[in-house]
Amino acid sequence: MMKMSPTARATPDEHLIAPGKRDMSHTPDATDLHAQVRARRAQLDASTRHALNIPEDSSELWGLALSGGGIRSATFSLGVIRALADTGVLNRFDLLSTVSGGGYIGGMLGRLFTRAHRAEEVAAALAGVDTRWFLWWLRANGRYLVPRGMTDTLFALAIYLRNLLAIHLELGIMALCLGCLLVGLDLGTWWWAQGAATRDPGWITSFGALPAWLPTLWLLLPLGVVAATVIVAAHWALTWVARASLGKVLAHWAGGLLLTLLLLGYQLVAGGVIDDSPARDTRRALWLVMDLLLLGWVLGVPMAAWRLRQVPTEGSAALHVEAARSLLTQRLATCFKWMAAVLLVGLMDRAAWFLAFEVQDWLATGMAAGVAIAVLRAVLPSVSKASASGGAEGAEGLTGMALNLIGYLMVLALITWWWSLLHKVVFGAMFDQQQWSWSPPVLVLAGVALPVLGYLLLTGRNASFLNLSSLHAFYRARLVRTYLGAANARRFPGVNHDEQGALATLPAQGGSAAGLVAVTRVERDDDIDMGQYRPQDRGGPVHLVNVCLNQTQDPRGQIYNLDRKGLPLSVASGGAMRVGTEDWRALPPDNALTLGTWVAISGAAVAPGMGAMTRGGMASLATLIGARLGYWWSPAEGGEAASRFGKLRGLVSELMGSFGGRDAPDWFLSDGGHFENTAAYALLAARARVIVMADCGADPGFEFKDMENLVRKARIDLQAEILFQRKKDASDPVWGQLDAEAWAQFGALDELAAAQSDVCVAVAKVVYDGRSEDPAWLIVVKPNVCNALPVDLRNYKRANPDFPQQSTADQFFSESQWESYHSLGRFLGKHVDLQRVQALSASGGLSPMVDDEESVVGERDVPAPQARDGAAAAPAPAAPPASSLRGTRAAIASTISLSAAATVGVSAWQGMEGWRAAQQATTDAHRVALGELSTMWAKLP
């Protein structure tokens, strides 16, 4: 498309170009954010730029942040967006940053811009009356994200069970592969023992001294003990070896070797003479310890000298020794780790043998394990609810620890069962023979090992299985049809997609189903490649979709990101990406993904990797019960060849909650709220001068935990200090020049939580890099109830006391509920206009706001929750200790993704919705069940 002049309208020739297409020769570099902003501003009418005081360059960035919070966030944010269109400032925003639920409506907004000819058309449609096709679609289909009705539920259940069985089949094959190695070791050890006893009957006595229950693998433990002894001896010998001369070291070492040989000779001679004397076992144990210590010394001295030669020689001698000592300590830890693994695997091997040959009903045990998984998924909400009702933080922590342990135990139990199956078929072939023979078990083992190994080798590169077997595709498809489909004119009858498209008004008689493409059907042009998605080309904002790059390990010592366990990844419309505070770079052209995929990833709240909330046991639990909404993505350019065992590595990473992160070839991505839920982080990183934030995370107690997280990360990562404001005193001279009534709804953060308050919008000053003389401004629009609300919202509040902080698990929005959140967002957002924003940044003491030293997020008493009209506010609960504020954020893990995963888990129960007579009762039951599941996942550490 030819670039229009600021004052020109599209010509008839330009109308021939399909909306969303563009002339690539005039497209600025996607990795140059400021070039994108300049090009965006140039697309606006000159009158728009003049009215909004928009500079021609890329300075004075304005950003709109839409936070996570599921369908509630999407609906409330839609109201805020329409309010900004009402006040005429929507087209002032250069950047649109979204997380999770905010991305639903943000993606729809971006698609409206890509299909429009001018940004002013979109703003006019959003500000107009509710007779546009896209608004009709959202109202009609906003609840489609969650299955409803018998047919829809059975469809979701089929997907869930198919994926769950596929995952367990892969895990079973992996367990069998490991089991083949273990059973092969057992067979080899038994074969060697039989041969040794045949050649020398004395071995029979030695083997008979071993306990019958001893796992074969534990025979390797003495080697580990010897290795650990040698490392310890080397550690204590380091200082002496470093200081002594070479001759002295050799002399002492030779003396130690001679003493060892003499002691061994003495034991052989003396043992034959007094072998039958009392305390024989004690004497042998003492001699064994002495032998071990001397052997450790003999081997430890050379090891100490070798390690001293390995470390760098720079620095003092003491530093040289300290470096060698640190290296030996690491080796000792590795030795202990391997010994622990041998102990654990040996114990599992013994348990597998017990299940195979000592349990009466072996198959019933496996079936019971499957039932246990289903029961565990069903009872987890009740366990979490019980711990939460106790009101004690320790109870929640104990529950989290218990669930983490249960996850590990479930993995071990699953592997053990598959090993017991292998024991049954392999050693059963040996014991079923009338005469002891090695051929049958070897043949059976080979018959299992060859196809298992062949399958792993042939399918190991199929890393796409990881995403296909998760719930991501199900979630993405519904999200695309529900929200991105609202901007697709092809879904609406009689609408020309080359003209107004979804911005067109409905016929006078209202929307008609005739010719309408149902939300259950796939329709072309719903989604778009991220590189082709460019709302900025039509004057819309550059859309930043934020996700979390999970990272629990690091090659630099495995301590980096110890608390966060994740990095922010922002993906910009046009095909650019940014990890943390690094420079922008292009998305890989062959793996840029689509807008719908990125928005779905941004809302993947329940996954084995959940940023700071990642725990190994919980990752195991999520994998085993099929709660997998995360996404594996390769950022490599040029399409590097897939790893031979990419699928295996990814599945093990999910099972153990271990992710390589930034430096790994494949990245595990999840909900952007797992790092930062308000979506303002990316705007602060871009040094935006004005940020309007729709803070919609679940916060029934108005504790502002998402805000606390933003304040802390902005200070640490971005050198941006967020200072909340309050209105100046009524006696301040500034009110002689400003209308106090116009600022009645602006105030301190605490005032948002007050039961009776006129304040409904909070303001913060942002100081970048310590430049307090040139601050930026953050305007927080948070769902709350203030005195000036319209009558219908106050009445809805009376009937629904939890409004507007109802659980994000509630995705069954009724008409009144949808309209209430939408209207609330529109009411609160209308207080943000150009005049107020300009007044905030006025110099010379003319700003109506001043620093509020009492509004320190995370370091003050939690305000009293908002009460119903006519009811007294509940007493404010005691503020949690500072340490607890670093815990799990309830708001982050409770998004629509959770509901999608949880709903399929209770799908049989949801089928009751089909009974028309119980329609309303069933809907209420759905809300209760999903609320409990959401509470459980939200409490996970």
Regions of interest found by a model, annotated:
Residues 2-941:
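Catalytic domains of lipid- and phosphate-ester/thioester hydrolases
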